[in-house]
């Protein structure tokens, strides 16, 4: 009986050690992947499109939330501290002064252009109205697909530098992704070229479509200029309504990541319908329309062109 029990215990210990070693091996393999942090869902999605399953990816600002102003969670602090590479937008979105990202990387003892990189590097910056100095940049450069391509190339460059063993995968995925974005950009320009000039006006809550306007030849109007300002004050709303009496667009649009009520007031008082919700600072939740950078841009381009052509 004692011998039999010893054999059973021996077998059990062998299985236990095998499972433990297997589990440890899995954890080691997982930890071997490049640890990447992106500040928001748009940058995270671009990174995922290029890297696939070659990295461990963490996105800081949750889907649907405003990346302009955010309070990092303990998990964000931990992931940032342990990251091999961090991607952020820059140009006045989440950085500068006492901005949340500036404090986050400082506390994590990370170094710019060594540990964290602005994916907007190299774009032609557009400034807020009446401004031209640092800290007054319009951050929404990704709303021009040509800039989205620049973002993607910057991401791929740093992934390759940090993880050269997966260079071939990153280059292959980048090439396919850029081709996809270029095709959509070309289609978008054709769509907006076909719309009458007197119908071209994008009206949104935040004045975030300057890059889009420049790329696709469609002027924009808004209630407030950037989400770090007061949003939807009576003066802002009445000022836009007065403009709309002169311009008379066929449709209004409201962003998925802002309070709808100011634009609903504009719609009610101006008599102009809200045609569609559109995406600016965040992609949609998985499985919903607009759940990737490509999908959100396609949605925006389709809905805006449809609304203006009415």
Swiss-Prot record:
Q: Where is Fe(2+) bound in this sequence?
A: 68, 140, 206, 281
Q: Name one GO molecular function term.
A: metal ion binding
Lipid sites, type S-diacylglycerol cysteine: 21
- Top-level taxon: Bacteria
Write down the InterPro entries for this protein, in alphabetical order: AdhesinB, Bact_metal-bind_prot9, Lipoprotein_PsaA-like, ZnuA-like
GO process terms (BP): cell adhesion; iron ion transport
Q: Which family does it belong to?
A: Belongs to the bacterial solute-binding protein 9 family. Lipoprotein receptor antigen (Lrai) subfamily.
Q: Cross-referenced PANTHER family, in alphabetical order?
A: HIGH-AFFINITY ZINC UPTAKE SYSTEM PROTEIN ZNUA-RELATED, METAL-BINDING PROTEIN HI_0362-RELATED
The name of this protein is: Iron ABC transporter substrate-binding lipoprotein MtsA
User: Which source organism does the UniProt entry give?
Assistant: Streptococcus pyogenes serotype M6 (strain ATCC BAA-946 / MGAS10394)
